[in-house]
Amino acid sequence: MTTSKEQGEKLLKEAQWIFEKDLKGAMEEENYNLAIRRAQEVVELSLKGCLRILGIDYPKVHYAGLLFVKEAGKKLNFNKNTLTEIERISRWLAEARAPSFYGERDFTSEDAKKAFKDAAFVIAEIKARSRY
């Protein structure tokens, strides 16, 4: 049986893999809707991985930002501005997920670049504090 810490580390490694392979690949191929979805996955898995390492259960929903700010923000050394930014990123990517998945909106290069930058920010902030 795996521990919460091991489960969390696995989620963080998966987030890193998706970032390096899928998200970067979608950007290179100019598949902007896929880039939005992969950025959302990176953020969701990063936040949930960190929560899991801390032994915090999370709901099985795509938006984890508010719980992360509330719980992990207390236990880890994040400044308020960083937490606010993580919550904003998590919210907008969770909201963009369905339209990008079902083709309800054609996301642009600028949207995808923003998503990429935001996912990179979140994964770097989590990585700096989780020591996986």
Whereabouts are the PLM-identified features?
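Terminal alpha-helical segments
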Residues: 1-132
